[in-house]
Curated annotation (Swiss-Prot):
Entry's EC annotation: 2.7.7.6
Catalytic activity: RNA(n) + a ribonucleoside 5'-triphosphate = RNA(n+1) + diphosphate
Quaternary state and interactors: The RNAP catalytic core consists of 2 alpha, 1 beta, 1 beta' and 1 omega subunit. When a sigma factor is associated with the core the holoenzyme is formed, which can initiate transcription.
Superkingdom of the source species: Bacteria
Protein's UniProt name: DNA-directed RNA polymerase subunit omega
Similarity comment: Belongs to the RNA polymerase subunit omega family.
Organism per entry: Streptomyces griseus subsp. griseus (strain JCM 4626 / CBS 651.72 / NBRC 13350 / KCC S-0626 / ISP 5235)
């Protein structure tokens, strides 16, 4: 029996080289993805409470897919924008 259901590929897809095109550095990518993953996790947590403060996943997700994998796929698809935070004025 063959299955046409695609399985999530986790952290290996999308490739790091493609993800780095969306940010300035690996550090920026990590922060960017972590913040979005926290938003996705908070969205799933608040679903049962009826609150809709956060935006849910912008890509199709799989049942057991981790928020970080979802965030990386959103970044790779160009669905998110980031803004640089300026440091304190000197």
């Amino acid at each position: 029996m063959s299955s046409s259901i695609t399985t999530p590929e986790g952290i290996i897809n999308p490739p790091i080289d493609e993800l780095l095109e969306a940010t300035d550095s690996k550090y920026s990518l990590v922060i960017y993805a972590a913040k979005r993953a926290r938003q996705i996790n908070a969205y799933y947590s608040q679903l049962g409470e009826g609150l809709l403060e956060y935006v849910g996943p912008l890509v199709d997700t799989h049942v057991h897919e981790k928020p970080l994998s979802i965030a990386l796929r959103e970044i790779n698809a160009g669905l998110l924008t980031s803004e640089a935070i300026e440091g304190p004025a000197q």
